[in-house]
């Protein structure tokens, strides 16, 4: 099911890039191979692909993912089951230096910090 969804989203991203639009994927690309697919789509459309990696301690990430979704309008699917969180984090492939990620400290996310990180 997830493969079909991401294949569909990749097709949409490809078409948007062909049409000269910008695309932002706000999701967890835990695997290098998935990020490589997006880089290829971008490259095929003469677009830039940039990985933004938000880093936090695993215990804080667990708390954010599994608690209090009802208090956040961005968490429309609710809390992630702890078992799903553990599966995802245990299989995580952080980006390598050759991917040139922009690394964001997830404990410092303020407007000023983000502007500084992205040079805005």
Locations of regions flagged by a protein language model:
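Short glycine-/polar-rich loops that comprise or flank the Walker A/P-loop
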Residues: 19, 45-50, 97-101
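Amphipathic alpha-helical transducer elements in NTP-driven molecular machines
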Residues: 2-10, 55, 82-89
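Small-molecule kinase domains that catalyze NTP-dependent phosphoryl transfer to phosphate-bearing small molecules
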Residues: 72-115
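Conserved nucleotide-sensing/catalytic segment adjacent to the nucleotide-binding pocket
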Residues: 1-45
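Conserved phosphate-donor/acceptor-positioning beta-strand/loop module used by diverse small-molecule
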Residues: 44-65
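Glycine-/small-residue-rich active-site loops that bind phosphorylated ligands and cofactors
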Residues: 30, 57, 109
């Amino acid at each position: 099911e997830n493969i079909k969804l991401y294949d569909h989203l990749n097709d949409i991203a490809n078409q948007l890039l062909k049409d000269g639009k910008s695309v932002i994927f706000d999701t967890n690309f835990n695997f290098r191979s998935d990020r490589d697919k997006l880089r290829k789509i971008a490259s095929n459309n003469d677009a830039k692909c940039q990985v933004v990696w938000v880093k936090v301690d695993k215990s804080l990430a667990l708390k954010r993912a599994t608690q209090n979704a009802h208090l956040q309008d961005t968490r429309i699917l609710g809390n992630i089951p702890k078992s799903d969180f553990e599966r995802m984090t245990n299989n995580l492939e952080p980006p390598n230096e050759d991917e040139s990620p922009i690394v964001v400290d997830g404990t410092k996310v303020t407007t000023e910090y983000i502007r500084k990180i992205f040079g805005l």
